[in-house]
Amino acid sequence: MYPAHLLVLLAVCVSLLGASAISPRPLNLIQFSQLIQCANKGKRATYHYMDYGCYCSKGGSGTPVDALDRCCKTHDDCYGQAEKKGCFPLLSLYNFACFPGAPQCGKGNTCQRFVCACDLKAALCFAKSPYNNNYNIDIKKKCQTLIYMRLQTQ
């Protein structure tokens, strides 16, 4: 093999190693957003649900502040169950249909169906739960876990 070919091969290998270190992007958030819009018939933009309460953001801790926040906690728990089954919920693309106010999951493999069911349940829960503008809060201050709060008081 020529030295130039070895250099090209080495460059490709280094590029692939660098690309593998890039975190995957949450691909299904667009689908989840579409399910939310379908379920609530476009009454509230999806971005309103970001940073709502203690669980409607990345991660979550503490006690859910209301019914809508409980929807988000249930959704987080559902994604946790999906991960235990070997699924990657943020990367799972699935099929669904939007019938006004009644989205439905379509066919797919076990993980796609499971993740779609998580998103569908959350979207329907969001649609029926009241939205309180006061709960778009700073989670670092308001949503500490009980253990963390106990440690601070000792």
Curated annotation (Swiss-Prot):
Q: Which residues bind Ca(2+)?
A: 55, 57, 59, 76
Which residues does the Swiss-Prot or TrEMBL record annotate as the active site? 75, 119
- Residues of the signal sequence? 1-21
Propeptide positions: 22-27
Q: From the UniProt record, which GO molecular function terms apply?
A: calcium ion binding; calcium-dependent phospholipase A2 activity; phospholipid binding; toxin activity
**Major place of residence:** secreted
The lineage's top-level taxon is Eukaryota
Query: What job does this protein perform?
Result: Snake venom phospholipase A2 (PLA2) that inhibits neuromuscular transmission by blocking acetylcholine release from the nerve termini. PLA2 catalyzes the calcium-dependent hydrolysis of the 2-acyl groups in 3-sn-phosphoglycerides.
Q: What is this protein called?
A: Basic phospholipase A2 PC20
The organism's lineage is: Eukaryota, Metazoa, Chordata, Craniata, Vertebrata
